Amino acid sequence: MTELIDGKALSQKMQAELGRKVERLKEQHGIIPGLAVILVGDNPASQVYVRNKERSALEAGFKSETLRLSESISQEELIDIIHQYNEDKSIHGILVQLPLPQHINDKKIILAIDPKKDVDGFHPMNTGHLWSGRPMMVPCTPAGIMEMFREYHVDLEGKHAVIIGRSNIVGKPMAQLLLDKNATVTLTHSRTRNLSEVTKEADILIVAIGQGHFVTKDFVKEGAVVIDVGMNRDENGKLIGDVVFEQVAEVASMITPVPGGVGPMTITMLLEQTYQAALRSVSL
């Protein structure tokens, strides 16, 4: 029988523990982890994500500051705001919600964030730490998936992991984290030939392609572990993953649902990295 990897339950467990760690940090050092989230414009999906992050941060005892800015803000003005947060000792994590308006270069915005406060793990200095095998701030979705593997005792050593999607947010950092655990990794993308033949070789299949119900059971080997990173809306507005859950659950040994799988863990890892940044600030 297929086992459900319950990201919602794991995130609740981790956030409860995080709340206890935050309380200890406050008692011992007088520090409350501070997270600043910057939202530019009024993208509906981004607004939902930001509200969820804000709620989770407050529930875990964090200081949470959300700055909502007009879509017309200039790149220079946004960078100035980031620099102010870089200097603010009560803020330990800075997150700029993507996507940004077209007139703003997201790479320059990411570069403006102090790497020690880059809780999304997108700054080149943090990606460098990741590639060198000494990760500090790791992109939150891959970090959350690794926690799922730990919690559910998924053995990675020597296993063939196939990732669909090569983004800097999920695919590439996910590949590096799996390599660090001695998995054999294949990174596929939209130009990969005979994709379903490649994915059918996977012991572990991670799908982050951003196309609703793209992966059917024809893509999946019997007994594979399937992680669905997709967050899409169908024609009725229902939230669906990149995987046809009902089909793939027939052949997979373990699978994440959408919603309630990877999404909650992404937010939990954002908070965990903000807490770790606050903890590091104690010894500075």
Curated annotation (Swiss-Prot):
GO terms for molecular function: methenyltetrahydrofolate cyclohydrolase activity; methylenetetrahydrofolate dehydrogenase (NADP+) activity. It catalyses: (6R)-5,10-methylene-5,6,7,8-tetrahydrofolate + NADP(+) = (6R)-5,10-methenyltetrahydrofolate + NADPH; (6R)-5,10-methenyltetrahydrofolate + H2O = (6R)-10-formyltetrahydrofolate + H(+). NADP(+) binds at G165, R166, S167, S190. Gene3D superfamilies: Leucine Dehydrogenase, chain A, domain 1, NAD(P)-binding Rossmann-like Domain. Keywords: Amino-acid biosynthesis, Histidine biosynthesis, Hydrolase, Methionine biosynthesis, Multifunctional enzyme, NADP, One-carbon metabolism, Oxidoreductase, Purine biosynthesis. Its EC number is 1.5.1.5, 3.5.4.9. Pfam families: THF_DHG_CYH (PF00763), THF_DHG_CYH_C (PF02882). One of its GO terms (biological process) is purine nucleotide biosynthetic process. CDD domains: NAD_bind_m-THF_DH_Cyclohyd (cd01080). One of its GO terms (cellular component) is cytosol. Catalyzes the oxidation of 5,10-methylenetetrahydrofolate to 5,10-methenyltetrahydrofolate and then the hydrolysis of 5,10-methenyltetrahydrofolate to 10-formyltetrahydrofolate. Belongs to the tetrahydrofolate dehydrogenase/cyclohydrolase family. This is Bifunctional protein FolD.
